[in-house]
Amino acid sequence: MKHFNLLSIILVIVLATSYIDAFTRNDFPEDFLFGAGTSAYQWEGAANEDGRTPSVWDTTSHCYNGSNGDIACDGYHKYKEDVKLMAEMGLESFRFSISWSRLIPNGRGRINPKGLLFYKNLIKELRSHGIEPHVTLYHYDLPQSLEDEYGGWINHKIIEDFTAFADVCFREFGEDVKLWTTINEATIFAFAFYGKDVRYGNCTTGNYCMETYIAGHNMLLAHASASNLYKLKYKSKQRGSIGLSIFALGLTPYTNSKDDEIATQRAKAFLYGWMLKPLVFGDYPDEMKRTLGSRLPVFSEEESEQVKGSSDFVGIIHYTTVYVTNQPAPYIFPSSTNKDFFTDMGAYIISTGNSSSFVFDAVPWGLEGVLQHIKHRYNNPPIYILENGSPMKHDSMLQDTPRVEYIQAYIGAVLNAIKSGSDTRGYFVWSLIDLFEVQVGYKSSFGMYYVNFSDPGRKRSPKLSASWYTGFLNGTIDVASQDMTQLQRNFSGSSSL
């Protein structure tokens, strides 16, 4: 018989109900940013146009599950239409990434003028509508040429090439970009794409027991190198901020046993501390060093000093919360994910409810717990919630009520965390529109706008969530008093596929 952690049950009840308290956009700090996001490969399309060369994501998606981002949402050609949707919504910031292989097709050296022009035009269009660009430099899409040449992130050479790429971006776009994320969810990228069963960029197997941690180490060094370059060369004039983002599940013990409590602390060390402890204190968590031994790379004294303090903010990617136990449990992540990483972690993950590839349970207290943990453990750094959203099957109705309920609950959690002292400065819904998704292709989607992927024109249609977010941002929706039935009725009369 399962014995639930009583404290966790109480927290679920108390914290979940607390989010129904009335709040509006005006309850957040004036400089808090509400936005939405996409990434280059998932949004742009135009994979073979205007000088772009293949990235490892092209290679992986073409050989993995048959669907790909060759056209995706065709954002490359439809960016003005999408910016207009953002402006109509009242979006304050738009998070997007720059395709390395579109801007610098060979990975280093020559800049592609058409790629450069596209991003300059996109940023100009955003600025002309009063929308703050938040630019991610790396969202999984390493130029395939660098993977073929030296193995990408498992080779120390990546640090120099990534820094040179970042230098081009800072120089060309930095006057109009004040928020930079170097690497998207570095944790899950390292353990998910360097696993035993799926190999990133070349679809072959490798030494996954070592490469996960080598890749993570090189990401930290590359981030620090780019960050230090920015601060030395550009920050005094451009006055921007630069950070790194991590994948942060909410983590809570499955039972009230001491073993599950300890397993949860180990999981937090591996999933949060792997990146955050070096960024804040200059070294890896003791739990990782004890467990991994020589498999965990070591920072030199100089590297430690470079990494420490290299993030002006921490980006958080959060979708749901899981239980953690010390006892063997069914594996809930996709079969392609690196199971050996979780074996190293010495903790088993259990879903809190009905979460799947097509739906996430809304567990807003889990996000609040993540923010409170980072506040207490890592000196309360500035935080941006860079991805938070709920997937649904792509052919679902436009009335995506579960997504609306999910988003408003998590926004309430962020507000609670801010009131408790968390220095959280922004919240970005994932995603603005339906995208190509890395694990499931076009089977499920996160978008607030529906995209008809069967239509060559990739027609966009607003979902209920777009209507709700618009109302929240322009101040016409009070979360506690909002009549969901009336919102659905108004919406159903104005939108169709």
Curated annotation (Swiss-Prot):
InterPro entries: Glyco_hydro_1, Glyco_hydro_1_N_CS, Glycoside_hydrolase_SF. It catalyses: Hydrolysis of terminal, non-reducing beta-D-glucosyl residues with release of beta-D-glucose. The keyword Glycoprotein applies. Glycans are attached at N65, N202, N354, N452, N474, N490. A beta-D-glucoside binds at Q42, H139, N184, E185, Y319, E387, W430, F446. Residues 1-22 form the signal peptide. GO terms for cellular component: peroxisome; plant-type vacuole; secretory vesicle. Keywords: Glycoprotein, Glycosidase, Hydrolase, Signal. One of its GO terms (biological process) is carbohydrate metabolic process. Its EC number is 3.2.1.21. Pfam families: Glyco_hydro_1. Belongs to the glycosyl hydrolase 1 family. It comes from Arabidopsis thaliana. GO terms for molecular function: beta-glucosidase activity. The keyword Glycoprotein applies. This is Beta-glucosidase 8.
